[in-house]
Amino acid sequence: MEKSLADQISDIAIKPVNKDFDIEDEENASLFQHNEKNGESDLSDYGNSNTEETKKAHYLEVEKSKLRAEKGLELNDPKYTGVKGSRQALYEEVSENEDEEEEEEEEEEKEEDALSFRTDSEDEEVEIDEEESDADGGETEEAQQKRHALSKLIQQETKQAINKLSQSVQRDASKGYSILQQTKLFDNIIDLRIKLQKAVIAANKLPLTTESWEEAKMDDSEETKRLLKENEKLFNNLFNRLINFRIKFQLGDHITQNEEVAKHKLSKKRSLKELYQETNSLDSELKEYRTAVLNKWSTKVSSASGNAALSSNKFKAINLPADVQVENQLSDMSRLMKRTKLNRRNITPLYFQKDCANGRLPELISPVVKDSVDDNENSDDGLDIPKNYDPRRKDNNAIDITENPYVFDDEDFYRVLLNDLIDKKISNAHNSESAAITITSTNARSNNKLKKNIDTKASKGRKLNYSVQDPIANYEAPITSGYKWSDDQIDEFFAGLLGQRVNFNENEDEEQHARIENDEELEAVKNDDIQIFG
């Protein structure tokens, strides 16, 4: 089909000035085809002018740049000429470089863990070795052996350091666990001591002599006797178990020297005397071990805190070793024993008056007997009234029981333990509360950023805002139902508040006022000047 005139004109108008070549066209494929022979291509053949011309046949002719002409650049300078080469040689160089890079990466991966723990001196040595190897052009076998030996040494050092760190962490963890166990044991002992305080107080009420015990048994019932026997068995069992525990403990820590005798004592039934004897022997063996342990740990604590270095605080009581402090406290044993014999609760044992009157208590002499022996002259002064009699006291006895050698009362020591325990509980509670307060404060700060839940319709008095007042604790309103004021008293009270006086004879005032008015009217009539029919 022939083209119309308009199509022919448009083809001529659109036709480009320079001829366009399609690289995918088979006719023009020879222009863009590279013929390689023996590893050499046509691109590397600069002598073939025909190929150059064919390749540049579709280029436009452009004049030289003015800038290039001004600067006078000479592109034909021999320094800009390249070196002849082939693709095969290029590929061989690339493959060699890739192999070297892979080997270096493998070696770096092997030595990465070891080289991470190098010191500065080792890094400098390695850098010097690398520079020498680069200068030589390759690594020798000796350098590889040295590097291998160095990596082994570094690995060994890292393993030792890791083992030391793990051992120190385990040691610290075991110390912390042992400290927690010690504090738990100490708290349990204090709790047990506090629970036994009631039993210690009740034991002071028991009879003091065998005669009073026999007399009490005669008055007791069968149930009471049975309970006494059961308590005696439990008491002996408890003491035997305590002594066996102490023997095992001292054998385990090598405190007891004679192990065979100690093992023989484990399976032995003891009487009351034997219990006291073995308790004393165990205490004497434990004393040396206790002083050594206290001295050891007190010196460690003082050296860690740095108090030992200060000469001014060296001789203070609180900075002395723990064993010395214990010995100082126990040195005045008579004073400590006297404090335990103070009868702070005014407890009187059963049949105490009778035992004292019959002279069964040699450590305690009745003031009645003492006055009769010493003061024969004052026999008429009333021997039944003791010297320590105080009429202001409700519980006056015939005997001075403020200091009783047959009573054991360590309430002052018990109160110290109780106060320490309470302070510890309070401090723990405060710590937990402070942690909770910090958590709540952080939550409050985070909540401040959020939109608050506010009732927008509660403004301008449309809703009444109120809060319920808590009831007053331990408050009771006065009850006035038993006695009430009369109306006259109420009027007089309020009139007195206002500074006035109230006359309660209201009828008499009215009569007097009427009488005065009548008298005034009579006088007015008498003094009138108007006369009728005068």
From Swiss-Prot:
One of its GO terms (cellular component) is nucleolus. The modification Phosphoserine is found at residues 41, 44, 366, 372, 379. Keywords: Coiled coil, ER-Golgi transport, Nucleus, Phosphoprotein, Protein transport, Transport. Residues 86-161 form a coiled coil. It is found in: Nucleus, Nucleolus. Residues 93-114, 121-142 have a biased composition (Acidic residues). GO terms for biological process: maturation of SSU-rRNA from tricistronic rRNA transcript (SSU-rRNA, 5.8S rRNA, LSU-rRNA); protein transport; rRNA processing; vesicle-mediated transport. Induction: Up-regulated during cold stress and following nutrient replenishment by dilution of cells fron exhausted to fresh minimal medium. Pfam families: AATF-Che1 (PF13339), TRAUB (PF08164). Disulfide bonds: none annotated. Residues 27-148 are annotated as: Disordered. Residues 52-77 have a biased composition (Basic and acidic residues). It comes from the Eukaryota. Belongs to the AATF family. Present with 15400 molecules/cell in log phase SD medium. Involved in endoplasmic reticulum to Golgi transport. Involved in a protein-transport step blocked by brefeldin A, which disrupts the Golgi apparatus and its incoming protein flux. May also be involved for mass growth or cell proliferation. This is Protein BFR2.
